[in-house]
């Protein structure tokens, strides 16, 4: 096998028929477009979503919902993720340095998912009730 002998399998490539080249070609005269009407003309396509002047469905249906601006700067961290952070004190800066939250985050909440075995001090983060109990049971403390 050589690169210059490569060819598609017979019948795999269907050659296109030229349109409007006589009645004998099978696609003469109207060229497969039918008679008259907007779609038979050159450039005669309708844009997507156009329904002939009727109010389109994307405008008939109501808008709903919104994106909370606070969710763009808020994040959550689990106890199992905090257990991996080096150091005794865990704050927003240490979480950013460890790569657990993005730099643009302003608020972080600690959730009780997973376990923590060493004593850590949570500084300046919101903590759920279950996470607070787990941290204090491990010998750590929470400073708001």
Curated annotation (Swiss-Prot):
Q: Region Disordered: start and end of each range?
A: 1-59
Q: Name one GO molecular function term.
A: rRNA binding
Q: Does the keyword Nucleus apply?
A: no
UniProt cross-references to InterPro entries, sorted A to Z? Ribosomal_uL15, Ribosomal_uL15/eL18, Ribosomal_uL15/eL18_sf, Ribosomal_uL15_bac-type
Q: Kindly list the GO CC terms recorded for this protein.
A: cytosolic large ribosomal subunit
Q: Where is the composition biased (Gly residues)?
A: 21-31
UniProt entry tagged with the keyword Membrane: no
**Listed Gene3D superfamilies:** 3.100.10.10
Q: Which Pfam families match?
A: Ribosomal_L27A
Query: What HAMAP family does the database record attribute to this sequence?
Result: Ribosomal_uL15 (MF_01341)
> What does the function comment of this entry state?
Binds to the 23S rRNA.
> What assembly does the database describe for this protein?
Part of the 50S ribosomal subunit.
Q: What protein is this chain from?
A: Large ribosomal subunit protein uL15
Q: Which organism is it from?
A: Pseudoalteromonas atlantica (strain T6c / ATCC BAA-1087)
């Amino acid at each position: 096998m050589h690169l210059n002998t490569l060819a598609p399998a017979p019948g795999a490539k269907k050659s296109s028929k030229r349109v409007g080249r006589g009645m004998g070609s099978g696609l003469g005269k109207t060229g497969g477009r039918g008679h008259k009407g907007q779609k038979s003309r050159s450039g005669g396509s309708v844009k997507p979503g156009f329904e002939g002047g009727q109010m389109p469905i994307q405008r008939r249906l109501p808008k709903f919902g919104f994106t909370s601006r606070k969710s763009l700067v808020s994040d959550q961290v689990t106890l199992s993720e905090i257990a991996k952070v080096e150091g005794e004190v865990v704050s927003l800066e240490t979480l950013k340095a460890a790569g657990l939250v993005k730099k643009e985050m302003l608020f972080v909440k600690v959730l009780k998912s997973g376990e923590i075995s060493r004593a850590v001090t949570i500084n300046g983060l919101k903590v759920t009730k279950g996470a607070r109990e787990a941290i204090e049971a491990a010998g750590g403390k929470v400073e708001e």
